[in-house]
Amino acid sequence: MKLGIVGLPNVGKSTLFNSLTKAGAESANYPFCTIDPNVGVVTVPDERLKLLGDFYHSKKVTPAVIEFVDIAVLVKGASKGEGLGNQFLANIREVDAIVHVVRCFEDTNIIHVDGSVDPARDIETINLELIFSDVEILDRRIAKIAKQARMDKTLAKELELVEAVKAHLEDGKMARTFEVPDDEDAQLWFKGYNLLTAKPTIYAANVSEDDLADDGASNPHVAKVREMAKEEGAEVFVICAQIEQELADLDEDEKKEYLEDLGVESSGLDKLVAASYSLLGLISFLTAGEDECRAWTIKKGTKAPQAAGKIHTDFERGFIKAEVVNYQDLLDNGSLAAAREKGIVGMEGKEYVVKDGDVILFRFNV
């Protein structure tokens, strides 16, 4: 999974990236300090994996990972190449989802590119640039197929879809809120346009330390972000990038103590992972043994053979059965053999839909 972190200058974008990935990306109090996208790989926190690793005394524990890309800052006119617009638009097109950092804190020492803190305006600035870019893509498609569509029913059908999506965008709406017809062709066409405004989006409301304890409930800027996110089907999580930067230098016990002192249950990374998995419809299944315990990320609704294919294509091709037990049931019973004796280990076939927290042993023959 690849997430692109975006935002206007001086909203805390690179500070957040630095703290999440400890990659040391340059962060400064002036626009355009992020020219090329910085990439960092972050392990997905998963207590279940640690418990299983201890249970099996595994030689190796391998968590799932998320790739973060700190994308060049965007300003008004990016769709026309202003600022670092061309690089921004090219880089953002490659990610699975967008993490849009929005400034929701007041600080006279940190300049705002527009002179004041206004998350609604900031969100609209970036969203409009993405819309303009998408409209250009659709215009090019219309120009390419309009003439042929007069004599080709399939192209005529696609032209109707393209024009409908364009009208939706020109109304100031994001492509992800467009209701694509329940038709295989339409679904494929829409996906093929790879529209920026169709990408799932998570808003990271960057607040001051004082707003963390109540999750931004008393911050009017956060309320506005939540309102806008609800309208466009996006997720929101509240974070203090400055605190995350401080947490990045602490060990696990120190982090836990620091968060407790702040009255906060979860770190920003934990919140972001949860929001990402929720938005993208992802779950994790686990493989476990003495050699290795590992978490594998899949889409909800994935069937056993396709889950096996995440490990190796041979597993999917030669799939026979999947021996499945919930991780907690396995731990509670002390061993896989004991769980088998109690009848709580399932032998599942090709139609089994994998569940979050399943520990699976695949049987295959190639």
Give the predicted meaning of each segment.
Residues 1-111, 139-140:
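Conserved G1/Walker A P-loop phosphate-binding module
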Residues 2-6, 17, 146-353, 360, ...:
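C-terminal-of-GTPase-core extension/linker across diverse P-loop GTPases
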Residues 6, 32, 37-40, 47-49, ...:
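Short capping/connector residues at structural and topological boundaries
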Residues 22, 54, 90, 128, ...:
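Short, intrinsically disordered, mixed-charge
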Residues 23-31, 38-40, 48-51, 80, ...:
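Glycine-rich, flexible loop/turn motifs
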Residues 32, 46-49, 62-68, 82-95, ...:
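Amphipathic alpha-helical transducer elements in NTP-driven molecular machines
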Residues 40-45, 72-82, 93-155, 168-182, ...:
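Conserved Switch II/interswitch segment of TRAFAC-class P-loop GTPases
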Residues 92, 354-355:
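Short, well-ordered loop/turn sites that connect or cap secondary structure elements
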